[in-house]
A protein has these predicted regions:
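Membrane-embedded and juxtamembrane structural elements of multi-pass membrane proteins
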Residues: 2-78, 111-310
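Low-complexity, acidic polar-rich segments
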Residues: 82-116
Length: 310
């Protein structure tokens, strides 16, 4: 019973978060020309709704039009109609006492059977949910071990940056003491751009954000909208990081930086990408965003920020 109640609560939060995620996806499309840091930030309410069972709904919220109690009423509508019809027939004398007694007994039996089927179904679904969580946890552990086995022979390049001939893309690995790992075939200019990109991840604590998001995703693995949201969130994370690199190093690096991303994509093989690391992904969209990047005006940022808050 405890497992079913737990899954029921998770399901409720997942459904509510789905509405928020759809709204975020729409807003994300509307502000697609805005800095990606805004697109990245608006995923916070989705993460919040996935873990918080308490609703904070304004009078203008669309959720006010969705009365969850009405769904519970609908569930018993058919049964209520049957009971009312039977009682009406008894009162009008259309059925004998024996038939009336049998009818009431049948209704009680049907109600018990329906409840039993519902409880069994919820129990089975809860078991499947828990199995899915365990599978994803095992996948995470195996991925972590496999990645660690590849980088344990890496050599120090400088500070917390390591080079390895066992990887073909750059990424941050580790949670408590994150380190930057880069492939050995990068040029010196590529190293500057790629290392700066990974340093931004570390400075913003993106490695913490991503692992929290993935752990939440494991709990809500049954919801396809959450998988889509996770992919889009990590995409916004990467592109906002690219924009920060250009802000730090100057917009004149657009072309060379794009070539660096493209080079990593061409050489990328089967390196495991796990939540504790950041490997290069969705290169096409990232390159397009880099080449089209323009430092936004302050008034534009203010308008977008006010629109998101509203």
């Amino acid at each position: 019973m405890l497992l079913e109640n737990l899954f029921s609560n998770v399901l409720d939060m997942s459904i509510t978060a789905s509405y928020v995620a759809i709204a975020v996806i729409v807003i994300r499309f509307i502000i697609k020309k805005a800095p990606k840091s805004f697109s990245f930030a608006i995923w916070i309410p989705v993460l919040f709704r996935l873990v918080c069972p308490i609703s904070f709904i304004s009078n203008l919220s669309v959720f006010n039009f969705i009365n969850r109690d009405s769904f519970r009423k609908i569930e018993g509508a058919s049964q209520s109609i049957t009971v009312n019809n039977t009682i009406s027939n008894i009162r009008s004398g259309q059925v004998s006492d024996n038939i009336a007694g049998n009818a009431v007994t049948n209704i009680a039996n049907n109600t018990t059977i329906s409840q039993g089927i519902g409880n069994n179904f919820m129990y089975l679904v809860s078991i499947l949910w828990m199995i899915g969580i365990q599978i994803l946890i095992v996948y995470f552990i195996v991925s972590y071990i496999k990645t660690y086995s590849r980088i344990k022979t890496a050599t120090l390049y400088n500070e917390n940056v390591y080079e390895s001939d066992q990887i073909d893309t750059a990424f941050v690995f580790g949670l408590i003491k994150p380190k930057i790992y880069i492939p050995v075939n990068l040029t010196e200019s590529e190293k500057i751009y790629i290392i700066e990109h990974e340093k931004v991840h570390i400075k913003r604590k993106d490695y913490v954000t991503k692992i929290i998001a993935f752990l939440i995703l494991i709990i809500h693995w049954f919801n396809p909208i959450m998988w889509i949201s996770f992919i889009l969130m990590t995409r916004d994370m990467e592109m906002s990081c690219d924009e920060r690199v250009m802000k730090n190093l100057g917009e004149d690096i657009k072309t060379n930086y794009s070539y660096s991303l493209l080079n990593l994509a061409v050489n990328k093989g089967n390196t495991f990408n796990i939540p504790l690391s950041f490997s290069e992904n969705n290169i096409k969209s990232r390159i397009e965003n880099v080449l089209n990047y323009k430092k936004p005006k302050k008034w534009f940022i203010l308008i977008i920020a006010l629109a998101i808050v509203a």
